[in-house]
């Protein structure tokens, strides 16, 4: 049995048999399909991912004890509007634990690497991803912090866990950050040169970090970039 959806050069091709038999398989072939569309189909709206997915997904025993796996490449992959490069990801799902296990690697220009491993569980409505970042763009902060920061052009290296209920996601870890960002209220740009920031529940903490203005003058910043489950960001710096 075959079914297909086409739009210009994009398509979804579905082929196979959906039965209780573990030997019967449904194959879904994707070509340049918008990730936002796919996530909408499974009602995932906790955070925004985008890009164009090409690859194969397979499902077995869909009316018995279903299993599924996929191998996908996502071009122009973004998280909350922030660029992360091209993502290669393997995923598998088993109904017994209800989790989608993820093993992904995003490669961006400038030898930026983001390694992603863990799971998302639609059944339990939770997430646990371990992310190793090497000079990863943090452009997504432009979405979260647009009320008080602008033109955020920073990069992070470190390890961060994305954990918690899907409606209350938290970031936990530590990263070295470098790059520039503008403070809207001061109409001034500042530069970080590899100091550490600490990610704790509902808080991103700066401890004695060095910052530089456009003339190279040094300042020391301590403070907090607070949020509520990755929303309603605010800051308290001195």
List each language-model region with its residue ranges.
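Interface amphipathic segments
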Residues: 1-161, 166-238
């Amino acid at each position: 049995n075959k079914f297909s959806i086409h739009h210009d050069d994009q398509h979804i091709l579905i082929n196979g048999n959906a039965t209780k038999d573990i030997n019967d398989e449904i194959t879904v072939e994707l070509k340049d399909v918008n990730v936002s569309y796919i996530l909408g189909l499974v009602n995932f709206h906790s955070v925004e991912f985008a890009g164009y997915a090409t690859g194969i997904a397979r499902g077995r025993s869909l009316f018995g004890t279903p299993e599924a796996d996929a191998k996908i490449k996502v071009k122009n992959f973004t998280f909350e509007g922030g660029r992360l490069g091209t993502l290669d990801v393997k995923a598998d799902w088993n109904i017994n634990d209800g989790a989608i296990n993820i093993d992904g690697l995003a490669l961006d220009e400038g030898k930026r690497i983001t390694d992603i491993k863990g799971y998302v569980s639609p059944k339990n409505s939770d997430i646990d991803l371990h992310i190793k970042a090497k000079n990863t763009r943090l452009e997504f902060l432009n979405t979260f912090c647009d009320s008080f920061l602008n033109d955020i052009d920073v990069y992070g290296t470190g390890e961060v866990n994305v954990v918690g209920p899907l409606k209350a996601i938290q970031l936990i870890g530590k990263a070295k950050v470098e790059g520039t960002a503008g403070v809207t209220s001061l109409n001034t740009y500042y530069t970080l040169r590899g100091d550490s920031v600490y990610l704790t529940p509902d808080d991103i903490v700066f401890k004695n970090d060095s910052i530089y203005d456009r003339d190279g003058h040094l300042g020391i910043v301590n403070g907090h970039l607070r949020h509520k489950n990755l929303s309603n960001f605010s800051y308290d710096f001195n």
